[in-house]
Design a protein with these regions (language model features):
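Catalytic loop of the DD-peptidase/beta-lactamase superfamily, centered on the K-T-G motif
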Residues: 1-29, 33-37, 95-96, 112-117, ...
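Hydrophobic alpha-helical segments
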Residues: 19, 42-46, 50-51, 156
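Active-site helix/loop module of the DD-peptidase/beta-lactamase fold
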Residues: 37-41, 45, 53-89, 98-99, ...
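Well-ordered alpha-helical segments within folded domains of soluble proteins
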Residues: 45-47, 102-109, 151-155
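A generic beta-sheet turn/junction motif
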Residues: 52-54, 235-236
Length: 273
């Protein structure tokens, strides 16, 4: 776990990190049972929940949802035209990649309405309890207000690497680019002419610079959060990495965008990938 020693020098009070090697072995550092705010990593849980609902037959990704002309797929892929916050569109659906907390919240509400239950109950019944994520709670907006531990996030990572809650074809769609070739902004990184996104998860593509490493494949998917957190899975080399901290990203963004890729490259090198 030499790569994980890099987090010892991060300018944060508390950090817990891990990586999963191609053989499934897990290396960790830091307090694995400490609860952190995941921030936007929560969006991945919304996307996975919707896909469970799709497999159950209660929703379709092509359901009308959100602004006129918008579908559930648009909402999850940040292609709805909604702004970061607010319910008044600033662009037509499918025309730009506009990162939107509101879009994710509307996707979660659409699923909840279809299921006839609150979204936090659906999340608990659909993901948290089946995966044994007993320390994870939704404490507000499903777009960013989930608290969890490294142990629990690793349980979700195992599901992403080897799905059992959704059909394999459904799982593949999660990390497949939706509405290809849309330009847009990744908050904290900048604007990209090609800004690929899946269904609640960012896809690395050819973005440069990026918060993942130079050794990560373009197929790498995941999310980083404003709470100073990150999760990525590289399906090409079958390596995953998680790092949770207690320092907001905005307070150390320049350092984070140097240190996070360095960690990713070190993890991949240690895995021999």
């Amino acid at each position: 776990m030499h790569a994980l020693r890099l987090v010892d020098d991060w300018p944060v009070a508390t950090v817990a990190a891990a990586f999963v090697a191609p053989d499934g072995s897990v290396s960790t550092t830091g307090p694995t049972d400490h609860r952190f705010r995941l921030a936007s990593i929560a969006k991945m849980l919304v996307g996975w929940s919707v896909l469970i609902g799709r497999d159950e037959g209660i929703v379709s990704l092509d359901d009308a949802a959100g602004p006129a002309g918008c579908t559930l797929r648009h909402l999850l892929a940040h292609a709805s035209g909604l702004p970061f916050e607010g319910d008044v569109p600033v662009a037509p659906p499918g025309s730009r990649r506009i990162y939107s907390n509101t879009g994710i919240e509307l996707a979660a509400q659409h699923l909840a309405d279809a299921a006839g239950m609150q979204f936090d109950d659906y999340l608990r019944d659909g993901i948290l309890e089946p995966l044994g994520m007993t320390a994870t709670t939704l404490d507000g907006s499903p777009a960013h207000a989930v608290h969890s531990t490294l142990d629990d996030v690793l349980r979700f990572v195992r599901e992403l690497r080897s799905p059992r809650l959704v059909d394999p074809a459904t799982a593949a769609e999660f990390s497949t680019v939706q509405f290809a070739s849309l330009g847009g902004i990744v908050p904290g990184l900048g604007r990209f002419d090609d800004c690929p996104w899946g269904l609640g998860t960012e896809i690395r593509g050819t973005k440069q610079p990026h918060w993942t490493g130079t050794r990560n494949s373009p197929a790498t998917f995941g999310h980083f959060g404003g709470a100073g957190t990150l999760l990525w899975v590289d399906p090409v080399i079958d390596v995953a990495c998680v790092a949770l901290t207690d320092r907001p990203f905005d307070e150390w963004s320049s350092d984070a965008l140097r240190l996070w890729p360095a960690l990713a490259d070190a993890v991949i090198a240690e895995c021999g990938a």
